[in-house]
Amino acid sequence: MGEIRVDNFSLEDFFSGDIDSYNYSSDPPFTLSDAAPCPSANLDINRYAVVVIYVLVTLLSLVGNSLVMLVILYNRSTCSVTDVYLLNLAIADLFFALTLPVWAASKVNGWIFGSFLCKVFSFLQEITFYSSVLLLACISMDRYLAIVHATSTLIQKRHLVKFVCITMWFLSLVLSLPIFILRTTVKANPSTVVCYENIGNNTSKWRVVLRILPQTYGFLLPLLIMLFCYGFTLRTLFKAHMGQKHRAMRVIFAVVLVFLLCWLPYNIVLFTDTLMRTKLIKETCERQNEINKALEATEILGFLHSCLNPIIYAFIGQKFRHGLLKIMANYGLVSKEFLAKEGRPSFVGSSSANTSTTL
């Protein structure tokens, strides 16, 4: 991941329209020497619509992920392994979403926050994106070990899980360093500044690197891990006789399905764009504009994932609902009778009490 579109300046007069395709896909602009004039469609209406969507996603993520963090921290004495992952995931998604208003403002006014904040916000969004996806893969492995192998040794040692989370954050930081190093500001015209990678004369080479990095570690590898782990987990649940089996399967299906719906379309379009920009398929103005529009639309789906995770991992699950109702009952927002009527959550999984598969 890496770039945010800024479409509010004269594209024909600078970079021959390539800045218009400036998006969150780590797609550095062409240099003047390799750019070809290509008029870009007017996206004013789309730009303002995207700004509204960014703000809504931020608000939904703020509410949803804050509630997840509140419930987990309030019940930290009974915190499970899955809860540790969920807490880190909520933090990552929350900070990812909090960067969106900045990029929304840049769509209207260009980048107005200076070179240092260009690096900081880009770096923060990059780290939180990587950590979010890597933590999703860790959760799938946790469920796989807990259900398929009924593993309790690693699960019971919470400090090891915390070490795994710290490792994921560190790995995310390392993967994000190219963005921090290369991202800077540039004047697109006398009145507009943009925030993007400055890669000099090695544009084509670095473009491939900055595309392969997020697509491999930010999508393909986590997806393969999730498909493998959840595939075997589902097979085990089908064979088992568990009272909450169908509920657990719904959550697992939702995890994979929503991840695919959010990120698969974007990555398909991004891969096509990479093939075009590396001259493996013919580049035309019509094709470039079509891909730019597709990147804009599918990018929004990817951003939506940051506010959908609380729904998938928490709101569907019994454990979260009971934890939230417990907090509300303690503050008199719901009656104790209602809390008792709802009952305590039950979980599916191994004999270990330190993991749940229904969240």
Curated annotation (Swiss-Prot):
InterPro entries in the record: CCR1-9-like, Chemokine_CXCR2, Chemokine_CXCR_1/2, GPCR_Rhodpsn, GPCR_Rhodpsn_7TM
Sample GO molecular function, one term: G protein-coupled receptor activity
Residue ranges that the UniProt entry lists as topological domain Extracellular: 1-47, 105-119, 183-207, 273-296
Gene Ontology CC: one annotated term: cell surface
PTMs per UniProt: Phosphorylated upon ligand binding; which is required for desensitization.
TM stretches of this protein: 48-74, 84-104, 120-141, 163-182, 208-230, 251-272, 297-314
Disulfide bonds: C118-C195
Alphabetic keyword roster: Cell membrane, Chemotaxis, Disulfide bond, G-protein coupled receptor, Glycoprotein, Membrane, Phosphoprotein, Receptor, Transducer, Transmembrane, Transmembrane helix
Membrane-topology descriptor: Multi-pass membrane protein
Spans within the Cytoplasmic topological domain: 75-83, 142-162, 231-250, 315-359
SUPFAM superfamilies assigned to the protein according to its UniProt record, in alphabetical order: Family A G protein-coupled receptor-like (SSF81321)
Compartments reported by the entry: Cell membrane
Main localization (coarse): membrane
An individual GO BP term: interleukin-8-mediated signaling pathway
Taxonomy, superkingdom: Eukaryota
Keyword Magnesium: no
Glycosylation sites: N8, N23, N201, N202
Pfam family name, one: 7tm_1
Family: Belongs to the G-protein coupled receptor 1 family.
Subunit structure: Interacts with IL8. Interacts with GNAI2.
Protein purpose: Receptor for interleukin-8 which is a powerful neutrophil chemotactic factor. Binding of IL-8 to the receptor causes activation of neutrophils. This response is mediated via a G-protein that activates a phosphatidylinositol-calcium second messenger system. Binds to IL-8 with high affinity. Also binds with high affinity to CXCL3, GRO/MGSA and NAP-2.
Record-given protein name: C-X-C chemokine receptor type 2
Organism: Rattus norvegicus
